[in-house]
Amino acid sequence: MNSLGGIRSWPANWRSTTASMTTTESVRKVPQVLTVAGSDSGAGAGIQADLKVCAARGVYCASVITAVTAQNTRGVQSVHLLPPEFISEQLKSVLSDFEFDVVKTGMLPSTEIVEVLLQNLSDFPVRALVVDPVMVSTSGHVLAGSSILSIFRERLLPIADIITPNVKEASALLDGFRIETVAEMRSAAKSLHEMGPRFVLVKGGDLPDSSDSVDVYFDGKEFHELRSPRIATRNTHGTGCTLASCIAAELAKGSSMLSAVKVAKRFVDNALDYSKDIVIGSGMQGPFDHFFGLKKDPQSSRCSIFNPDDLFLYAVTDSRMNKKWNRSIVDALKAAIEGGATIIQLREKEAETREFLEEAKACIDICRSHGVSLLINDRIDIALACDADGVHVGQSDMPVDLVRSLLGPDKIIGVSCKTPEQAHQAWKDGADYIGSGGVFPTNTKANNRTIGLDGLKEVCEASKLPVVAIGGIGISNAGSVMQIDAPNLKGVAVVSALFDQDCVLTQAKKLHKTLKESKRGI
């Protein structure tokens, strides 16, 4: 083993010679992430958080340490930078051996260290680079000097696929630009995008006077505001590292950028929610549990990729309607999502299993590319086979508790409920949301008893879960449904109002507009 200052001479054919030791027939590809960051002795952030996140998301993670910190829940007491020569040795060691899908950077506390990283990334290209410009922690601790701002702007940001600054870091990168509102976050994201990264995510978790946690995502053309309720907890140490590492892990698994960002935000939200009452350390900012998804309590780990606001415009497909209008399920799905559908349920009553599976795989590709969840109606086997985001089951289908045991804690499970008793049972069994109805008469389901607006409100009041209304809902009555004064009513599910129409895109836009207007009127 070399000393810290020693540099090993690596043979040019190092990777190719070792790769020949494994036959192609025996290879099973494992998603791989490299994190280049500082060590946190308290283990809530930095390298330690990165390793835990990747393990929790099912991704292999290697590490290169740039600095060693002395810190705990009370703050950062000291920072020791490792010699750039030794950091280069670490980088060469892992980059010459592993085939990383994504490199994620955290604390890069000197220009020399950034230079070393840039040189090694030039020598060993990777598919994606996630840059978390760790300069100011959420708690306000300064972790990097101002001298590296120029090299970040001029050299690192232009090669990044995504950067994930908090508002303080975004302000520093923009020469002190003031960021105190969502509008200013949007302006900052646009200005940062002009520096070269393909995507920008400005994190607003510490935005002053905001009841929500709001992150602004910008792809160069469109803005996405990713909102979630602010969670009251002291255990927020390492949220930025966790978010960036989760994005890297999802990218390594093949997700689109928007989908990776959405999954990462929900992962952090649910980790914070699960950990809000734990006590580790005596300081003001504690760590949280990255492995909440492994806990046995079905209530403790639900919704790891589920945001109740995704129920807003819930599109349920119908193959017969698509055939009637001479369009494929893929075309129908694209139009619905582009028009504003926020979640998709694939319902197929006619196709054989193999045909249904191929259809589901095609739909998964469309949904993931747009960051929209896909649920399978009834068929647990299809959901497992295509790795859908979840399922929706009825009262006569497989019991929810058994579905949860088969799918695990990460998948979304919805269940149809007509009564308060059914709604209560859905919560106990581990469902994530309730589909309640039919609210009005409908032709899409035979002999379906309607419950009306009063019945819908009763279910909402009895439920601890978010609710989506379904049954006979369209542009003419969607507003009245959303105005029944039930805070946990998150949206409407539609079938014929979308898919039994000449233009799915136009109808989706109209429905989305109607729902937004009704929500503002509440």
From Swiss-Prot:
UniProt entry tagged with the keyword S-adenosyl-L-methionine: no
Cofactor binding note from Swiss-Prot or TrEMBL: Binds 1 Mg(2+) ion per subunit.
Chief place of localization: plastid
Subcellular location: Plastid, Chloroplast
Residues that coordinate or bind Mg(2+): D378, D397
Catalytic activity: 2-[(2R,5Z)-2-carboxy-4-methylthiazol-5(2H)-ylidene]ethyl phosphate + 4-amino-2-methyl-5-(diphosphooxymethyl)pyrimidine + 2 H(+) = thiamine phosphate + CO2 + diphosphate; 2-(2-carboxy-4-methylthiazol-5-yl)ethyl phosphate + 4-amino-2-methyl-5-(diphosphooxymethyl)pyrimidine + 2 H(+) = thiamine phosphate + CO2 + diphosphate; 4-methyl-5-(2-phosphooxyethyl)-thiazole + 4-amino-2-methyl-5-(diphosphooxymethyl)pyrimidine + H(+) = thiamine phosphate + diphosphate; 4-amino-5-hydroxymethyl-2-methylpyrimidine + ATP = 4-amino-2-methyl-5-(phosphooxymethyl)pyrimidine + ADP + H(+)
Enzyme Commission number: 2.5.1.3, 2.7.1.49
GO BP field: thiamine biosynthetic process; thiamine diphosphate biosynthetic process
Class of the enzyme per the UniProt entry, highest EC level: transferase
Record carries keyword Metal-binding: yes
Ligand binding (4-amino-2-methyl-5-(diphosphooxymethyl)pyrimidine): Q345, L346, R347, E348, K349, N377, S416, K445
A single GO molecular function term of this UniProt record: metal ion binding
Binding site for 2-[(2R,5Z)-2-carboxy-4-methylthiazol-5(2H)-ylidene]ethyl phosphate: T442, N443, T444, G472, V495, S496
Alphabetical list of SUPFAM superfamilies matching this protein: Ribokinase-like, Thiamin phosphate synthase
Necessary cofactors: Mg(2+)
Gene3D superfamilies (UniProt xref): 3.40.1190.20, Aldolase class I
Pathway recorded for this protein: Cofactor biosynthesis; thiamine diphosphate biosynthesis; thiamine phosphate from 4-amino-2-methyl-5-diphosphomethylpyrimidine and 4-methyl-5-(2-phosphoethyl)-thiazole: step 1/1; Cofactor biosynthesis; thiamine diphosphate biosynthesis; 4-amino-2-methyl-5-diphosphomethylpyrimidine from 5-amino-1-(5-phospho-D-ribosyl)imidazole: step 2/3
GO cellular component: chloroplast; chloroplast stroma
CDD domains, A to Z: HMPP_kinase, TMP_TenI
UniProt transit peptide range: 1-36
Effect of a null allele: Seedling lethality. Mutant plants can grow on synthetic medium supplied with thiamine.
PANTHER family: HYDROXYMETHYLPYRIMIDINE_PHOSPHOMETHYLPYRIMIDINE KINASE THI20-RELATED, PHOSPHOMETHYLPYRIMIDINE KINASE
UniProt similarity note: Belongs to the thiamine-phosphate synthase family.
Its biological purpose: Essential for thiamine biosynthesis. Bifunctional enzyme that catalyzes the phosphorylation of hydroxymethylpyrimidine phosphate (HMP-P) to HMP-PP and condenses 4-methyl-5-(beta-hydroxyethyl)thiazole monophosphate (THZ-P) and 2-methyl-4-amino-5-hydroxymethyl pyrimidine pyrophosphate (HMP-PP) to form thiamine monophosphate (TMP).
Protein name: Thiamine biosynthetic bifunctional enzyme TH1, chloroplastic
The organism of origin for this protein: Arabidopsis thaliana (Mouse-ear cress)
